[in-house]
Amino acid sequence: MSRRNQAVGAYGERCALQHLITAGMRPVERNWRCPHGEIDIIAWDGPVLAICEVKTRRTDTFGAPAAAVTGPKARRLRVLAAQWLAETGTRADEVRFDVLSVRVTAAGPPRIEHLKGAF
């Protein structure tokens, strides 16, 4: 991944995090990594633990950002969430998997779409 794409992705994650905070969610972890992958943001939405995948795009050339979350990616996030819960000892009666699509353009602020329970 190019440095520019990394910078755009990092910017998108910061925007998504601020969006979640503004919406009243409480982030508990950001960019949690293990040998099997990474979870972008983990946050409480009231009593629900939200595992959030952030996808950022500058254009729609390759489709909507959320379209990049494929079946294998969703399965991997489920495994990662179970691992995070086990490692941290966190208890959650409900775990939800969200996708935040961030569209960054040169004109205007980024557009953020938060798909709760995306998969």
Swiss-Prot record:
GO molecular function, a single term: nucleic acid binding
Pfam families named among the record's database cross-references: UPF0102 (PF02021)
InterPro entries, A to Z: Restrct_endonuc-II-like, tRNA_endonuc-like_dom_sf, UPF0102_YraN-like
UniProt xrefs under HAMAP family: UPF0102 (MF_00048)
Family listed: Belongs to the UPF0102 family.
The protein's name in its UniProt record: UPF0102 protein Sare_1228
Organism field: Salinispora arenicola (strain CNS-205)
